[in-house]
Amino acid sequence: MSHGHRVVVIGGGIAGLTTALSLIADSPSPIHVTLLEAKDTVGGIIRTSPFAGLPAVDEAADAFLVRVPHAQQLATELGLGAAITAPTGAHASVWHNGMHDIPADLLLGVPAKARAFARSTLFSPYGKVRAAVEPLLPRTTDNDSIGHFVRRRFGREVHERLVDPLVGSIYAADTDSFSMEAVPQLSALTAERSMLLAAGRARAAAAKNSQPGAPIFGTPLRGMGALIETLSQRVTALGASIILNARVHSVTKSGHQYTIHTDGKDYEADAIVVASPARHSAPFLRDLDTHAGQLLADWTHASVVLITLAIPATQWPAHLTGSGYLVPKPDQRWVTAASFGSNKWAHWRPADGSMIVRVSLGRDGLDVMHFDDDKLLNLALADMKLHLGVDLQPNHVRISRWAESFPQYRPHHFARLAEVEQSLGLRAPGVVFAGASYRGIGIPACVQQARTASTATLHFLSAL
C-alpha cells in the first residue's frame, strides 16, 4: 500500500468502532478511515446513562464474557483493564409456578453433572429421569435447531425450563428457530454422542484453564458505555473520521472504486466494512449485488424493551437476595426476565438503599413494541406481582426500546452468510462484514469479527 488507501466502515457499534481502530493501528502504511453512523451517537445497542442518583446504569448489555478474551483484551488495550469489575456472585433463579434456584454445573442450561441436577426443585421426577438417560441415547445428527436438539437429548423440561430461558434471555430468541451453530458453547457439545458428558468435560477444562474464582463476566465501573466512549475517542485520536447522522442509502462501484451515498455527502473508498445490522445493510447492498441484498433482507430481528426501576428499600422483600430470575416461555405473559441489579453489581446500590431492577419484555415471537410506555410499565409490574408476590411501586422508571435490535440466527444461518459473501466476493471484492448480524451476537464475538474484518481488508488493500 504505497499510497493512502481509503476505507469506509458503515456502522458505529462496537464492531464498527473496533474495526476502525484495528485498521489504523495495524496498517503498515498510511490509511484513511471514515466511519459512517446513521444515528446521532455511536455504540449501537450499548448505552449507559445516569439513573436514580447513580452515574451509570446500563440500558442494554451490562457485562461482557471474560472467559472469551476478545472484549477483555480490548478493554485492556484501551486502558480500562483496571476498571473492570465482576458481579457479586448472587444466584439466579427460574420462575415456574414459584422460584427455583438454577441448578449448579450447567453449561448454558445443559446439565454437566447429573447429581446437582437431580436435587433441583425445577423438574418433575419424570423430567429428571428423562434427562439422566441422555448418555444412553444414540447420537443425534440433526443439530441446527437448539430446541429440537436439546429436546431429543434431554426431554421437554430441560429445554423449556433451562436451555430456552437461558439462551433466549441472551439472544431474545425462540430456541426452536435458533441455530445451534450460532451458540459455540452449545455447538461444541454436539460433536460427541452424549451432550451431558461433553458438557462435564467442557466445564472441567474451563476450570482447569482459569484461575480459581476467576469471574465469568466483567463490566467497566462506568458502565458498558465507557467502553464505547473510550474506543471512539481512541479512534478519532488516531486520525479516523466518525461521521454521525450519516445514513447510507446506496453504494455504487466504478472499476475498483466504491462510492458510498448518504443524504448529506458521498464518500469514496477502496474497501468497505459493513458493520451495520443486516436489515439496514440489505437496501444499500442491493445496488452492488441484488442476490446478496435480498438474502440479507430476509434475515429477521427481534425487539426488546428493557424497563429499569428503582424500588424503595421498604418495599423490597428481604428474602430476594439473588441476582434475578428467568421466565420459561410456557409461563411468560410479557416479562421474560428480571435482573436485580443492586444484588448483582455492588456499584449499582443507590445511597437511599433502593433496589435497581431491570425487567425485560419481548423476544422473537412476542412483540411488545406497539405498547406505549404506561402500558409497558403496567404489564411489567403486573407480571412482577405474580412472580414476586408483592405490589412494587417504583420511585424512578426508565424505558429503553430496542426495536429490531437482536438478530435471529435461523437454522443454517452460516450457510446463508457464506452464500452472501461468495456472491459479493465475485461482484464487489473488498466488501466484508462484521457485527452482531453476521458471526456472533455477544460483545466478544463482535470484537473478534472486527479484528478479522480489519485483517481481511488490509490484506485486500495490499494487493491493489
Each PLM stretch: what is its role?
Residues 5-35:
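N-terminal Rossmann-like FAD-binding beta1-loop-alpha1 element of flavoenzymes
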Residues 129-249:
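Active-site/ligand-binding neighborhood in enzyme catalytic cores
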Residues 15, 41, 279:
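Conserved Rossmann-like nucleotide-cofactor binding loop
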Residues 67, 152-153, 169, 275-276, ...:
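Short, well-ordered coil/turn residues at beta-beta hairpins
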Residues 24-52:
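Glycine-rich FAD pyrophosphate-binding loop
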Residues 52-138:
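Dinucleotide-binding Rossmann-like beta1-alpha1 core, especially the glycine-rich loop
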Residues 48, 103-111, 319-321, 336-464:
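Conserved flavin/dinucleotide-binding core of flavoenzymes
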Residues 2, 244-357, 363-374, 386-387:
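Mid-domain catalytic core of redox enzymes
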